[in-house]
């Protein structure tokens, strides 16, 4: 039988304040700072709307991290917070202890509320003050508005959720009194007319990360393109499932791609570029690469169709010389010369830490072209080569070239062709012997930190089986 710790006197006093329907600002002016966070949480969860309005106006910190609290279904309480902010923004005289400058609705790992709750329980308010994180300001609008609202936009349904709808309507009516700062924008599915109305409310200069994954065709991309060009502080761009409509002529495609790629001339902070299943890149990668103004740290081009000329342009691009991550998985290279890939690896050898060449269809006759450059990537810590149909001899040769890469922590290689029957199914009677030979070869060469060999995708479940020292049959 557990014994509950009785509430502290301060805690009891604070709760009595919430029960007081006539709670006055003068009372809050004298309330100890350490009582505000736990009492605010209780007022929010109990929907004490009048108390919330007053507590927002007397909030003794520069920042109010509200996102963890609105995960509770309390739209009424959220509206009360906005009403309290209204009073701050419109009244001429502010409360004596007013400090609030930032309403933070970002979905980040935040222990503000937990720290102060534990402090209330244990009386360790000094530790709570020490554990406070510094306030994150928006450099774009410093000092121009009395309040900054940080928000992350995740547009995944046809309509906005009720909290975001409530917030955006409130912001729209007070746009001259506050600054709406969105650093992360994720578009996973919404009619573009709705997206457009939201983008018009946001200061595009503030956006640092954008992810678009909603099966757009080129005509829709053209509507998004002008907004992209205004995101001058964009650091990360992820595009996925962009298709060329069958109604778009080659001439129209070229014009649309040109309009899109020229926007990259304005993105002077871009460091991470990821494109997955983007069909318009075929034959046009040079247009995009020539418009890059910064040295990329991360480049991901996956499950796309590229021409051999696209690979050549990629190897010659000056903006990729400092890459830390290169992911070309799902790019079919079977019938291409890998000399451009060799040149590319030579360029990034001094900085490359992550290399993914899964499912590129690389065969025995192509591997030798990249081995000298690969063996000079001394910073490489992760290398994945699954899904490439190479023989046992070629795999052993590959392993002998990666032996000198001392920073390699994770290595993934395909099961050699000898592991399969003529119809392409894994031969479980032959496979254990091949695995044993491979592991012996690896141990003779070095002591890997983490090395896995993987099968082709199972025709029944679609998954790969990974194995190291033990070979387990597919779970299906």
UniProtKB/Swiss-Prot annotation:
Domain of life from the UniProt record: Eukaryota
One term under GO cellular component: cytoplasm
PANTHER family referenced in this protein's UniProt entry, alphabetically: PRAME FAMILY MEMBER 11-RELATED, SIMILAR TO PREFERENTIALLY EXPRESSED ANTIGEN IN MELANOMA-LIKE 3
GO MF term set: ubiquitin-like ligase-substrate adaptor activity
Residue windows of the LRR repeats: 97-124, 179-203, 204-230, 231-266, 267-292, 293-324, 325-345, 349-376, 377-401
Keywords: Leucine-rich repeat, Repeat
Record-given protein name: PRAME family member 5
GO process terms (BP): negative regulation of apoptotic process; negative regulation of cell differentiation; negative regulation of DNA-templated transcription; positive regulation of cell population proliferation; proteasome-mediated ubiquitin-dependent protein catabolic process
Disulphide bond pairs: none
UniProt record similarity statement: Belongs to the PRAME family.
Keyword Repeat attributed: yes
